[in-house]
Design a protein with these regions (language model features):
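Electrostatic, structured charged patches in enzyme active sites and in nucleic-acid/phosphate-binding
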Residues: 1-135
Length: 135
């Protein structure tokens, strides 16, 4: 969150708690069942038109829900175009032996189009390596 607080347009952030009545939820499908995902952070930024909300989901690469959550985030972004600034899955990625923090912004159509058809963590990892924004 330190990085998010540095830009001059930063306004506030919220730790989105799991399973609270007020929690923000993005649905995703896991094993054929609709499952709720509670993205970790919501960041508010000032804009000329008021406040823009960003959804940030730091996610380890060693969990079985990686690609289903990424697809769920991409579907959510497609269903809510323009409602959020960024809708990002973030993780540590190793490229050529160097680890870097990278993000896939599902609010970007080009990223979303690559993520929507995936069905494996290997495919998601390749997209992080090729298209992930270095943070």
């Amino acid at each position: 969150m330190e990085r998010e607080q540095k830009p001059p347009d930063f306004y506030a952030w919220l730790r989105n708690a799991d399973r609270k009545p007020w929690s923000f939820v993005i649905p995703y499908e896991m094993g054929g069942e609709a499952t709720p995902m509670y993205p970790d952070f919501i960041v508010a930024r000032k804009s000329n038109n008021g406040i823009v909300l960003d959804i940030l989901e730091p996610h380890r690469d060693d969990t079985t829900d990686n690609w289903p959550k990424a697809v769920g985030m991409a579907k959510y972004a497609a269903a809510h175009p323009g409602d959020f600034g960024r809708i990002m899955m973030i993780r540590m990625v190793s490229v050529a032996g160097t680890k870097t923090l990278r993000a896939l912004d599902m609010a970007k159509l080009a990223v979303r189009n690559k993520v929507l058809p995936i069905t494996t963590d290997v495919q998601l990892g390749a997209i992080f390596a090729s298209d992930g924004e270095v943070l």
